[in-house]
A protein has these predicted regions:
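Rossmann-fold dinucleotide-binding core
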Residues: 106-167, 171, 177-180
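Residue-level detector of alpha-helix initiation sites
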Residues: 33-34, 82
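Rossmann-fold NAD(P) dinucleotide-binding segment
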Residues: 66-70, 74-117
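Hydrophobic Val/Ile/Leu positions in short beta-strands of Rossmann-like dinucleotide-binding domains
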Residues: 28-29, 77, 145
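An accessory alpha-helical subdomain
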Residues: 170-278
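Residues in the short beta-alpha loop(s) of Rossmann-like NAD(P)-binding domains
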Residues: 32, 55-56, 149
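N-terminal hydrophobic or amphipathic helices and topogenic motifs
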Residues: 1-27, 32, 44-49
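NAD(P)-binding Rossmann-fold cofactor-contacting core
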Residues: 37-38, 44-63
Length: 278
């Protein structure tokens, strides 16, 4: 409504007023993807001259980005972790002069490449926007900024969000994936499993609970399969989270199959201790 639109305009006005990127250049590697396009718009609002280095980008823009990359003030990799790791390995021979950062959802495959690039003299940061490319209002969104040991590079990324209403969360680089196994892997897998368990034919009546879960699951299963597979498969902590989900479902099934009303009540009580109160 009006409040949402007002806050959105205020965010953009604050970014332009701050003019953080005025006179600076930024290259987004993988900028033709949906999140890459979001980053280019975001950086442009900050005053940066920003362009995409991506095979799917128009030739003129791609050429500009290719030429700008070695001396650009900021280089953000909006590519899958494996592709970003490969780029970092290539750049160790001649690191970009500006701050290099990734937005990967999984950090484990990047830890060694980040260290190698730093050893080669690069300034490297790492962050993770906890929202998708359709996000307009950042007030209810989180951005995780990982500590790479380079305070200057990390500060550059933090300043990008200072003029917005986003909530910045700092995490050690090595802790990121352990936490994301709960925040992403568990949540996504639960939504996917719910979608797969739905009947083939729709019922004429729906509960508010079903509607809420259907809406959540519908959003998840329409995201990029490749990205969501990487979130599960490349995170070394994912399987432990998924085993917890399987164990929890088994406990529910066991309580019902054994007609254990007290056990079922205990499950709901335990669930209340793990979820926010209303």
């Amino acid at each position: 409504g009006l409040i949402r639109a007002s806050v959105t305009v205020q965010d953009k006005d604050n970014q332009r007023f701050a003019a953080l990127g005025a006179g600076k250049r930024a290259v987004v590697v993988g900028g033709a993807g949906r999140m890459g396009q979001w980053l280019i718009r975001f950086l442009t609002d900050q005053g940066y001259e920003a362009g995409s280095l991506d095979p799917a980008t128009a030739l003129d823009e791609r050429g500009w980005a290719h030429d700008a990359l070695p001396s650009a003030d900021l280089v953000i990799c909006s590519a899958p972790p494996a592709a970003t790791a490969e780029l970092y390995a290539q750049w160790t021979s001649a690191p970009p002069a500006g701050v290099v950062a990734d937005i990967a959802s999984i950090k484990t495959p990047l830890i060694e490449p980040i260290r190698a690039l730093q050893h080669a003299g690069a300034r490297v940061a790492s962050f993770h926007p906890m929202f998708g490319p359709s996000a307009v209002l950042l007030r209810d969104c989180d951005v995780v900024i990982c500590d790479t040991g380079d305070a200057e590079a990390t500060g550059t990324i933090e300043k990008l969000f200072q003029s917005t209403t986003v909530h910045v969360v700092h995490l050690p680089l090595a802790e990121h994936d352990r936490i994301m196994a709960d925040v992403l892997s568990l949540a996504h897998a639960t939504a996917i499993a719910f979608a797969l368990a739905l009947p083939d034919t729709k019922h004429v009546v729906r509960s508010t609970t079903l509607h809420a879960l259907e809406t959540l699951a519908a959003n998840i299963v329409r995201e990029s399969p490749d990205v969501y597979y990487e979130i599960q498969a490349l995170n070394p902590y994912s399987m432990a989270a998924l085993q917890r989900m399987r164990g929890a479902l088994d406990r529910v099934v066991d309580a019902i199959a054994s007609r254990n009303a007290e056990g079922f009540r205990a499950l709901l009580h335990e669930g209340r201790t793990r979820t926010p109160g209303t």
